[in-house]
Structure formats: C-alpha cells, structure tokens
Amino acid sequence: MLRLKPALLALLFALGGAAAAADVRVAIVSRTVFYVPLWLAQDKGYLNEEGLRATIEIFDNAEKINADLRSGRSQIAISTPESVVIDAYRGGSLRIIAANAERLPHFIIAKPQIKTLQQLRGARFGVLSLNEGTTYLVHRLAGAIGLKPGDYEVIAVGGAPTRWKLLQEGKIDAGLQPFPLSYEAEAAGFTNFGPISRYVSDYLFTSVNVDSKWAQENRPVVQAFLRALKRGQSEMAARPGEAALIAARELKTAPALAERALADTARLKILSPDLSVSDAALGSTFETVLGVGLLPPGSVYARGRMVDSSYLVP
C-alpha cells in the first residue's frame, strides 16, 4: 500500500474527492454478527464517503490476520484481542484501537446425544485457534462445571460457520456458537446449554486492531475508518429491519433469524456502543490470558500498553 506523509494525507482528506481515496484491506475472522456494522458501512457507502476504498477479507484464522498486519498486507483488523495483548506485553507493535464485541453472544452447543453438562467429559470442542477467543472461554466453562484439562479435547478448526459444519458432520462434539448459528443448531436438534455469559460476563471478544507503526503513519485513514464503522453501527440500531437483510445475506441465514440476532445483540448489549474499550471487558480478557500462562508471571494490567484510543475521535 502507498504510504503518504500524514500531513499530505490529511490535506487530501480535507479536500475530498477521488484523489483522497485510500486503499484499505480489512481483515475479519469469520461471518458473525459482530461484523454487521462493517458490512453496513461498506454497503451504505460510508467507507467511500470517508475517502476509503475498502476490501474486506475473511481469514478464519486469527494468527494469519496478525501476520498480515505486521507485513502490511492488511492494514486494519476486526479480530480477537488476546494475541494483541500478548504481543504488546512482549514489546511488539500490535495495538487495540477500538472495541467491537465486549460481551459474549455465544451459546454452548453440543451434539444431540449430549444431554447434560457432565456428559461433556471426553468431548471434542471446536475452537477458532488454540491461542485465541473461544479457546479460553472453553477452559473457563470446563473449570466451572468441574472438568480438568485432561477431561476434554480442544481442537482448532476455525470460526463459527466452520464449527457448525463440523458439528453437523460429527467431527467435533461441542462448540461455542454465536447467534444466529445457535438458533440454527437448536432448531436442528442440537443441545443448547445456554449462554456462555452465565460463566463469563464482560469480555473483550473482538476488537479493532492495527500495527501501530502503520497506523501512526496513516492516522487520517484510521480515523476515517473508525468514523465509518461508527456510522454502520448507528445504522444497525436505527434501521434494524434493513440491517437484517444485509446481515442475512452476509451470514447466509434466513432474514427472520438475522433480525432475531440483531435484536438479541442490542438486548444483550454485545457491541461497544461508541467503540470505546471498557476496562471491565479488557480486564477480563487480560486476566484470562495471564491465567493460562501466556503473559510473564506477575504482569500487571496496564491499559496503555495494549490500547491506543487516540484514533477514536468524534
């Protein structure tokens, strides 16, 4: 990607027009309800109006997203925050610049033969990655219901759509599924043990992430992206029926299920309302990463090491 001096880029954005357009590749993990504001920002032209030509790429792999941020192949990611926290505490350049999902929309879904939580002993849990997201939630769930690490298996298979496919094929026994996939699973006869939020309340599950070296050189681009994302989220709240049609298209589900998912997203306050990162959500994620030994022993929560909120402006 062409790197323009910040002062020149700011001038171009101020002047507007086609000359100001900047190419931005946005990496996301999977097709889940968290990304509806982004899809709306693209579909409604908010990204274009901010002077951005955005390409959205679905990776189904958080580690590859981080590698692409470092290499510059992707400029912005809406992805899992755990590896960003780890990278920051190791002196790396990845940073969280805004929040996305700060509460969990996942339900504990198991194959129909599993009827009780105790029957999850010996189960194969499908997760996105062994070092991200649902992995840590599975461990916290297991501990809460009395299972030890050797009592179950965690397998990295990919995002929620992939997990649903593997559940149906019998290749995994259980997984944490966000809505609307949780609705589809329950309708298909799979066991729904309820929301993971019974065991984990606030948790920064997805965030807007960048390589700080690139972001510092392209501040107007980053700020423009966040403004467009905010507009997409406002659009989702203001016109849920229309947003549900776009959600249904992108999530590859029925419009009625998409509308239900958006209603539940609002009711459960899944998304950060203003994209700001709350200490309650980030702190829970930090404590989880620390607890599984991926940070140096004795590491202390320091928001400024992980988060740069300076890009999030009105």
Positions of predicted regions on the chain:
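Bacterial N-terminal signal peptides
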Residues: 5-16
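Sec/Tat signal peptide C-region and signal peptidase I cleavage site
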Residues: 17-21
